[in-house]
Amino acid sequence: MNNIPIKMSLDFFVFCFGQSEKLSSQLRGALAADSPAMAARSSLDPTGSVLSLDESSGISDHEGFSSAEQDNFSNRKPEDQAKNSSDSEEDVEAKNPLPDVPPGCGPPTIPLNVLLDFSIQHVYHEITVLAELMQRKTNDQGEQERKMSLVHFAHATRSQFLKLVALVKWIRVSKRMDVCYSIDYLLDLQSQYFIDTADRLVAMTRGDLELARLPEYHIAPAIDVLVLGTYNRMPSKIKEAFIPPAKITPREQKQVCARLNQLIETRLSRLSSGIPPNYKEIHVANGIATLLVPGEFEIKITLLGETEMTKWSLLNIKILVEDYELGMGLPLVHNLQLNQIHGVLQSRMDVAVNPVKEAFFNLHSFCVSLQLDVLYCQTSRMAAGRLRENIVIEKYDPKERMLVVGYWVKRSKNKRLTVGQVKIDAQYRVQIYEDKDDKLGGLKVRHFPHAPRLGTIDCASGMLSMDRMLSETFAVRCSERLMRLRRILEAAEPLLEVRMTGSNVPTLSLSLLPDTSSNEEMLTVSVNSFCGKVICNINVLNSENDDLVAFAKALYSSRCSGQTIRDYLQKLRTSLVIERYRRSVAALPVREIKETELLPFVKVMLREAPKQRIILQYTRSENYYLIVGFIPEGEDVVTTKLQLLECDDERAQFIPLDNDTEVFQTAVADAVEQGTMRFKNCDDRISLLEECSREQRLAFAIITVEDRITYMYLATELQKKGVGVELRRDDAHVPGGLALHITNVKTVVPFDAAEFFKCCVRSCLRLDNRTRHTFQFEMCFENIPLVRDVPHGLAHRREGDKDTTWVQEISQVNQMTPEKLVEGIIHRLMRYLYMYKVVHQFSLAYEQYFKQWCNVEVYTFHKLVVSYGENRDMLMVLAFNVKSQNPGSQEDYFLMNFGQTMPHSQFNTPEVDWLKKPRYNPHAMMSQLLRDELKKNNDLIYIMHYLCETIRPFMVIGKFGRIRFQSQKSLSQLIGPEVFFPYRLKYHLAVLDLTTLRLMRGNVILEIKMLEGQKVAVRDVSRYRARCAGLYQLFSNIDPVTTEIMCEELEIPESDNKINAGPTMWKPEQFMDAVDVPHEDDPRMKITSLPILMTHDTIIKACDFQEIDGHVTCPLDEYLYSISYLQRALLTLERMSPRAQQGPANNLFSGYVTVVDAKPDYVRFKATQLNGDGTNATAMVYYKIYLCPEAMTLKIHIEYDEGTNSEATPKNLTALSTYFEKVVFRCGDEYALQSYVVMTRVTSFGATASIANLMNAQMDISLESKCCLQLSLTYNNTTSKKLAPATKVDQQLNNMIINVIISQSRKADSFSVLRFIYRIKEWVICYSCLKKSEVNFVTVPSELNKQLIDDVNTEVKTTGKCAIWALVSLVSDRFRSGEWNPSNQDEPIISTVAPPAPQQYVNPPSVAPGSIAPPGSGAPQQQQHQQQPPPSVMQPGSMMGPQSVNAHQYGMHRQMGGPPSMQMNPSSVGPPPGSVGMPGSVGPGSMMNPGSHQQHMMNPGSVGPGSVGGPGSVNPGSVGYPPWGPGGQQYHHHMQYPPQ
């Protein structure tokens, strides 16, 4: 059985000990080398082994040296053998087979040279030290010491070097020791191999060989299986473990349970007479009887047989006693204890006559003991915790089952007790015990002394709580003590009202004072339920008040007489009155000072004051103290005494408060009497009950004294300034009674103010301290020069009185010193005087002249408010600036502000619309000039005359000054580098003087001069030269009768800036052809700089903004916008000139035009027709954009060469012109003009009629229309933020791309884009299916779109009509039918490209419109290396780029036209208005060249980095235009200007 493991172990042993045998052989060889046998050996072992040992050793060497090793031993060099010829042992070393000792494994060594060097250095050091020491020893004794030192040094040195000599000699024979080192290393290595082998054997035995044993075969079961064919010898344990015994059926279970229930009920009925009544429940079910005693225990018993001798079996015991305060409801009896009780009780039941009764008495006794122990534990916890000072356990006897607890403990010390001991005496006790006579009863409670409704213990529930019982007991004891105290208090003072208050915590409430109404002044007496002590409290008093604490101790003690109670109540009443006085002055400018805070010399003066007193210090006059003393006299009489203490430096004195001295003679005397109340009167005795209501009188006295002190300081400061004052008594109803009257101000007024003081009846200063400490400056006037008046018919606005009194507050008195207060009074008076001087002169002319032009809203001597204007809705507010009186001040004398108010005509009307039309007072622009004028002349008559005369024209002219931005994005991209903020202010309105204004738009400057006689002069003062063609005709159209030209023309100075401020511009000969036939100029459009004289009505009509054709404008605004648009149109056409093109051309562009002639009132240009001839076309189209003299707005005239365009009918030409006026001109975008020119050049196959139909469809859209068609003129690339024309042609002029926006209405946010390419030469619309891998971002048309294109091409080839209108009509019809719905999708409805050419080519990637370089700039570098398509085929995708369609890209021209300006909130867009360049200054980076042709079209000084381009341009990328509304064009969502 063990053969296999043994064999495996031997094999492993042989394997592991292979290396060990080799090392053993080497060791034996080394030992044999020293023996004579080794020296005599002449030949090797036949097996090749170096060593040959006898077989008796039991070990044979199976490994021999190789042939190379044998040669090594036989062929030793003579040199190696001759090195140590003197010693024969070196031959043995040469043949030593022992292994070399690795470094670090042998004994430690040190080189000989290091040892010698160390010895030499040591000797040298000793010699050096010895030489230094010998120099110090000079006497005889030193000589002896030197000799001894030399001897010692020589002996030590000789001994050291003798050791070195011995060591050197030993080195010759030291090599014999190397064999010992090798032997030691070899033995250590072999020992390690043995250890590793043993460890491996143990690991194999415990792991791999654990199961390598033969099993014990069962012969007998094998025979049974082979002979009988069955296995009958399985252990029964297996069957019992896996096969459960058979169960009885449910019916049998019910029968058995019913029988057991019958037997149990029968046996219990026999014992019923002896069952204790404590068993409240006996329940028999399922063969088990459950007996329950509430709060104690529950047992379950049964019978295990039917015979009479069957004993009761106790199944379970459950203890119902619980403790939720300490044990948290956990079981109080351990399971082992229950098991022991179960065993004892079962044995007693077996021998008992009545087992049920026996079980009850045993368990009942145990549960009662357990309940008492629980109560004791709870009491111990409370006695050691929160009630440790209030309860004490006097007795606990578990045998007698008694617990006595004392509560409300009194601790006292007695001389008989040991030092540190305290006598503990409980006032009340509670005893918990078990009655010996009542065996069936539980724990009982007895209180000492007895009282009704005391706490008990509920033992039946099982939830015992000593805390609850004590809490109920404390509540009853507190009520008992309070009732006893109530009887004591009522007996001591029968008239005292004592009420029992409180529901949860009962208290006694006593009203000490007769007028006490709040609970804060009630004396409350309560009992501490924990310790039983009496607590007295008054909320207004400190809880640590000595009288309250002493009164509470007196009530708690057993010796408290009635007289003692009355004394304490009297003290408490006095303290309460004092607290009333203290609180009454809390809000006054005084603070209570403790006596410990006073200086020593002040404390000396307080010896004369009463002991019960309050010391108050005035916060504003800190050297004055008011001492309020209380002197009790008798039982119900008290005297209040006031004393004023003045402290100056280190001296203090009392100031008497009597009634003998007059007020104006003594500053602070008679302060109390002035309040009509005497605080000290020896004849009158004031009782305490009367004194309790006099705290308000004390407050009045304090304030009165302080007022006198303040008046004293103020009068002194006024007299220092030279102002005459007089302190007088006024009427008694005036608070304070005194007023400081001002009598003389001649020394502070720089001019004669006699007229002012004739009107001034009274000027005084009163002190108002009712709510806060303020001074009221009162001025009483008669015969006021100006009073309030309003137009007739306004009943609720009555006229002002000629006699009135103004009372104005001098604020911030609390933070001001008397000097600042006096300065404020003088400033207030100076304001009155200066205002009166100006107003008095104006009042003389007001009644005679100005009353019909303006009205006085209010005049209060410090401010004048006048309403003027036609509706009296403009306000002028005038006030005097007191800061101008400061020495060296540059402030204006007068503060003049302008505002608006509701028109007087709307005061009584039910509908008020003044909020719908915000008003702006234009005189606010020149408020500074008006202030300077008033300061210079002090003439308010001239100011009011100017305001009334100029308000009407300024109202309309001032509307140009409102902030309105215009976009310059398209222009900045077109003519130069794009700026960061492509917006500029539309207008600049500058004020030169009171009569001269300048209105600037771009490089156009108009000067408006206000003249007398309601006349206005307007002239063109633009820099370098006049630019307003037809300016006189504009005003003459409004009023030809009164408009005239005044004087000679004024020269405009040349530019002072000769340096180029921008890129070089082209000269006229570079982009204009020579005019063969000069154009005849209209004399009405004459350019002049002469002033044009007109009336106010004319300028008002010219500047009155009204809503016309859906946009808000006025004639002058329309005129200036047209002049500016012509200049920008010329810049746009310059970029379309062939000569302007530089560098390689783009695949798509807007075509070339040639400017023929350009004047300030018109621009003429021409271009070739797009009739299918491509670049070889010769037919021309002639354009003229001009300023119409009748309408003073831009119009266009288009003319085709005769016979070249059959569709150029008057109807179609009218449609093209109207579209320009309503859409292209109104939107103000340069790229829109380029798209318009391209579309009007297409003439092939009746394209002019199709274009005219599209334009008419856009302009004639009604609100009921279900399909809205709009041409897209400008394309905005949201990725590159660039703009481009939406309509372009290729370089060969054979293909044109058109975009049409289709939506349900102009207001619809959802829309679709119909994008197609029109083949000019073939008049068809076609497509090409391109994969996305071939052309990026190009969408393959759907089958429905392909079918639609085929249908259109078939129709146009049959009828010969133009395919543009045919396609649009078909799409719009299907759109109305609901086949297509607007969707804002990223792909267009129709995505078409040019048809493929006969030769195949690869389409290059698409280029976004923003990436197309404008004319005159080089194409992108990356496009130059791309493969170009054939010249006859348009490059697919080069225009459209990513097929991204959104409201920002196509939202610009979804409407008929755009406003001439972009209404935008300046706070949300761009820099403030001040950052926009003003005329006359050329900012860095200006885009205009002063010396070029551009300077005549645009003011170089008005174009800065942030204000590039002309007016009217709209950026559809950054500000989306809303769609059309019912009334035409809708405006931006910001505030409209002018207001509707």
UniProtKB/Swiss-Prot annotation:
The keyword Transcription applies. Residues 44-59 have a biased composition (Polar residues). Residues 1404-1427, 1475-1492, 1513-1522 have a biased composition (Low complexity). Coiled coil: none annotated. Pfam families: Med14, Rgr-1_C, RM2_Med14, RM3_Med14. It is found in: Nucleus. Residues 1531-1540 have a biased composition (Basic residues). GO terms for cellular component: core mediator complex; mediator complex. Signal peptide: none annotated. It comes from the Eukaryota. GO terms for biological process: regulation of transcription by RNA polymerase II. Keywords: Activator, Nucleus, Transcription, Transcription regulation. Belongs to the Mediator complex subunit 14 family. Component of the Mediator complex, a coactivator involved in the regulated transcription of nearly all RNA polymerase II-dependent genes. Mediator functions as a bridge to convey information from gene-specific regulatory proteins to the basal RNA polymerase II transcription machinery. Mediator is recruited to promoters by direct interactions with regulatory proteins and serves as a scaffold for the assembly of a functional preinitiation complex with RNA polymerase II and the general transcription factors. This is Mediator of RNA polymerase II transcription subunit 14. The gene is rgr-1.
